[in-house]
Regions:
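Conserved class I S-adenosyl-L-methionine
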Residues: 1-36, 47-51, 67, 125-148
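A short acidic, Gly/Pro-enriched loop at the edge of an enzyme's catalytic core
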Residues: 84-95
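A short glycine-rich, Lys/Arg-flanked "PGG" loop and its adjoining helix->strand segment in the class I
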Residues: 108-123
Length: 251
């Protein structure tokens, strides 16, 4: 069974544009300076990368060929690369990442690769899911799989740490943590929960027979609606984010 997600730039832009829109405050934390070279790690379709590129030299990095192509169509330089194996050495003044680290299975390796990619005193600026992120839906997904005799822990793709746990990873990799905070950010979806699940819950649904997947997703929606859907049938997910800024120490 696979934890792979097949990213579709069209449906992502339609149903998940809020991911980039809500990442805009992170650009202020990045505060890029003229002449800097920045990597956007997990750049997706390049919506935020494009904004960074207005002031500095930027390279987007993503594992998805489809998303990389969408970013390239914006005129951005993109590399298709696994964040666990970046293969850059002291190249960047800053590494920026939004809503990507929680998809990466070995966060300690990611942090090490970012450290190697940065120049001395380079900045690592990011935001991703924290402990408790989308907990209602995650719990419903797990329950639905267990009911079908499938171990959800073998499929769950998400890494949602506490601030303390992620701070320890940064310090161990020889970063100085300038700031780290947990932000509770209830997020209203542009469409229904089903649209969100079809994008983000693929590692769970891939374990279900194709002719049973819609039934499984409907069950997840039913388990979640009391907590997440209001009287006007608008869905608001219990997003919790971890936002951080760290600096690479002297080598």
């Amino acid at each position: 069974m696979s934890r792979t997600t097949n990213w579709n730039p069209v449906t992502y832009a339609r149903d998940a544009r809020f991911v980039a829109d809500l990442g805009k405050p992170l650009l202020e934390l990045l505060a890029p300076k003229k002449g800097e070279v920045v990597m956007d790690l997990g750049c997706g379709d390049g919506a935020l990368t494009e904004k960074i590129a207005q002031g500095v030299s930027v390279i987007g990095a993503d594992t998805s060929f489809a998303q990389a192509r969408a970013a390239q169509e914006r005129g951005l330089p993109i590399v298709v690369v696994d964040g666990h194996h970046l293969c850059f050495k002291r190249r960047f003044d800053a590494v920026f990442t939004n809503a990507a680290i929680h998809w990466m299975q070995r966060p300690e390796k990611i942090v090490q690769e970012v450290w190697l990619s940065l120049k001395t005193a380079g900045r690592f600026i990011g935001e991703f899911g924290a402990k408790g992120n989308v907990e209602t839906v995650r719990s419903a997904l797990h329950k639905g799989l267990r009911r079908r005799g499938i171990d959800p822990l073998a499929l769950d793709p998400w890494y949602f740490p506490t601030a303390e746990d992620f701070s320890k990873l940064l310090i161990k990799a020889n970063f100085t943590v300038r700031s780290i905070e947990i932000i509770e950010r209830p997020t209203q979806l542009p469409g229904g929960l089903l649209d969100w699940l079809e994008i983000f819950a693929q590692p769970f649904t891939n374990a279900i027979e194709k002719n049973q997947r819609r039934s499984f997703l409907n069950e997840v929606c039913e388990r979640s609606e009391t907590a997440l859907r209001d009287a006007n049938e608008r869905w608001t997910l219990d997003y919790v984010r971890l936002r951080f800024a760290a600096v690479k120490l002297e080598e």
